[in-house]
Amino acid sequence: MKMKLSFRWYGEDDPISLQYISQIPGMRSIVSAVYDVKPGEVWSEESIKKLKDDCDKNGLVFDVVESIPVHEDIKLGRGDVDKLLDVYCENIRRCAKYGVKCVTYNFMPVFDWTRTQLDKLADDGSTSLVMYWEQMKGLDPLKDDIHLP
């Protein structure tokens, strides 16, 4: 088995277009997700198909989903967990229908990737995620409805 080159794409708002990604030698696979749906809601087939079609138009394959967000109530074992798990499973089935072969998952306790800023500028001009403790320390995930960037 060979390692497959894949590239993360954040959808139409990503400053790097699929056209640019397709120019990377050996790049065939896109890792993406439906970003405009809250955790615990079903992804529309239209949104998934659009991702696939956009990739196809650029000679790329949308076959990896970077995490269908896990609702906090699943992690905390509260609320209507069975319904939320059904929604999660339905999202997996819908992705499979449109050719997705791999769904990464993130069951990090309480918060997903903990960060407070998505574009921290480094000295070399690159950007990365960053978490500032001062912005996080007053949050209580058991009491507050918290959404990080």
Model regions and ranges:
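Active-site acidic/histidine proton-transfer and metal-coordination neighborhood
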Residues: 74-149
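Structural motif
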Residues: 24-25, 98
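Short, acidic/polar
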Residues: 11-23, 51, 83-93
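Hydrophobic faces of well-ordered beta-strands that scaffold small-molecule active sites
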Residues: 3-8, 28-32, 62-66, 103-105
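Active-site-proximal loop/turn and secondary-structure-junction residues that shape catalytic pockets
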Residues: 11-13, 36, 68-69, 107-111
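Glycine-rich, proline-tolerant flexible connector loops at the mouths of alpha/beta enzymes
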Residues: 33-49, 111
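Conserved, mostly hydrophobic/aromatic
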Residues: 21, 30-32, 55, 95
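Active-site mouth loops of central-metabolism enzymes
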Residues: 2-14, 72-86
